UniProtKB/Swiss-Prot annotation:
PANTHER family, alphabetized: INOSINE-5'-MONOPHOSPHATE DEHYDROGENASE (PTHR11911:SF111), INOSINE-5-MONOPHOSPHATE DEHYDROGENASE RELATED (PTHR11911)
GO MF annotations in UniProt: IMP dehydrogenase activity
Protein's recorded name: Putative uncharacterized protein HI_0221.1
Domain of life: Bacteria
Top-level taxonomy: Bacteria, Pseudomonadati, Pseudomonadota, Gammaproteobacteria, Pasteurellales
InterPro entries: Aldolase_TIM, Class_I_gatase-like, IMP_DH, IMP_DH_GMPRt
Similarity section: Belongs to the IMPDH/GMPR family.
GO biological process, one term: purine nucleotide biosynthetic process
Native source organism of the sequence: Haemophilus influenzae (strain ATCC 51907 / DSM 11121 / KW20 / Rd)
Pfam family, one: IMPDH
């Protein structure tokens, strides 16, 4: 028997007449599903199903040519619709990708970096930064050397990745 908690789906109810039906159908196919009110906090959503690996959050990724996607119906795209599930030849992958956060969080980090850069270059405007900025190529070894040494990072900052 498969673990129904392997995949979790959270549905936020904004008042649609089909929300309950969708949740029921998801449960019927053996996937764990919860239905929450629309005004839930962002933190509660993050805590619902964090897929953590080595302290970082990840999202599932399934390419259309992966075995899982083909078993769910994309096999005809790859001219394998007549093949049994155990005879499918995958042309894609399944895995996980780092979860970087909501767009507003990413933009917040980018804006902080831009402000820092403008301060370091003495620029008051973006137009001035365009003319004063000088891009310098750093080798892979140089990037590695610029990181801290002999420290095991226990929690990465949103704007600093070691790998």
């Amino acid at each position: 028997m498969t673990n129904i908690h392997y995949h979790k789906i959270l549905i936020l109810d904004f008042g649609s007449q089909y929300t309950q039906l969708i949740a029921r159908r998801v449960r019927e196919i053996g996937v764990y599903c919860e239905l929450w009110a629309w005004d839930v906090t962002e933190q509660x959503i993050r805590e619902f199903a964090p897929e953590l690996y080595q302290g970082r959050a990840f999202k599932s990724y399934r390419g259309m040519g992966s075995l899982g996607a083909m078993a769910k119906g994309s096999s005809d795209r790859y001219f394998q619709s007549d093949n049994a599930a155990d005879k499918l030849v995958p042309e894609g992958i399944e895995g996980r990708i780092p979860y970087k956060g909501y767009l507003k969080e990413i933009i917040h980090q980018q804006m902080g970096g831009l402000r820092s850069c403008m301060g370091l270059t003495g620029c008051a405007t973006i137009d001035e930064l365009r003319t004063k900025a000088e891009f310098v190529r750093i080798s892979g070894a140089g990037i590695k050397e610029s990181h801290v040494h002999d420290v095991a990072i226990t929690k990465e900052a949103p704007n600093y990745r070691m790998g």
